[in-house]
Amino acid sequence: NRYAVVFTKIVDVTLENAKLAWLKLHEPENWKKTALFSTMQDYFLKQFGADDYYTDYSSASREGMMDVDNECWSKEMHDILGIDLSKRAKIVKEPGKVVGHIGKEVSEKSGLPVGTPICMGAHDQNCCTFGAGAVDDGTAVLVMGTFGSCFVVSDKSIRDPKERLVVKGNHGCGNFTIEAFSNTAASSYRWYRDTFCDYEKLMAKEQGEDPYDLINKQIATSPIGANGITFLSFLQGAGGARINGKARGTFVGMTLGTRKADMARAVMEGICYEMYDIIRAEEDSGIKIDKIRLAGGAAKSPLWCQMMADIFKHPIQILENGEAGCLGAALYAGVGVGAYKDCHEAAKVDRTTKEYTPNPDNYAAYDAAYKRFCDVYDALDKKIF
């Protein structure tokens, strides 16, 4: 419980603290010789010309080694692992801070002009949040790409009593992001395409179309609930609000009458239900969500966007710039070199192009399908996973 309160993290083997514990146990000689414990982005910054090893506030706060509320490395956690704080990169709280300049050697290798400022960015998902204009309390950013996540900006460092959510500093904005992740998200849809849709890929190539457009047309012929088919989207274990590395992807409910359209719709719905788990966990913890902005490949599908609006019961806003992460990183640099006064001014660059409004007529059908999704998971978790 203290871990969840101080470090605002779920217990997860992917985090830095778990990897450091493994390294200390299994490679003691390398551990003894280590002069600095650094993340890869800190190392790259130094190689490009930063004058020291630096890490940004959002990246530092996600690894279970930082006291997030006090905005510093946790001496307690470092003492547990036997790491002197002098062996850590310096935490930078100022958005886009200039930490060095491109020198001659790096310029020759990279093509970047000598003297180009090197600015601190942020964790990739925080760059995405910033690029989506999420700087104020109540704005959520849903990333539906290879990896899925839902970030909600909050003025309060809220703790989830069930310890399903992560709290991080919202770099440069003076507040926090409350978040959770899906290990697959749109990767499950890509898996379905590559495993079951050779014909659609061939037809798309001949017609000069995207295979996903053909699959989406099929999905539109299947009703809400996919004619009773449920797909658990846990092809790399369950993330999000369930945190179960042993969970697996599953189709349940197929009959001789099941069509590919039903299976495809079940996959799309299953991905949405896993993300809905996260949104429900965030709202159950007292976090308000006023609007959801969508980034990632799923934003290209009107069918999928409307499905999310109906399942989440929130409007879904589509960003003008689909590469929100790249935009966010550029905006941090803009703040750092003085092109913008602060993050709030920089965030005004963001624009939304379309909004999908929830259709209340579809709530009951999706709620029933979501309940079945939860029931299938619970049954398999007890006996199979």
Which stretches of residues belong to each language-model region?
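N-terminal low-complexity or amphipathic/hydrophobic leaders
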Residues: D56-S59
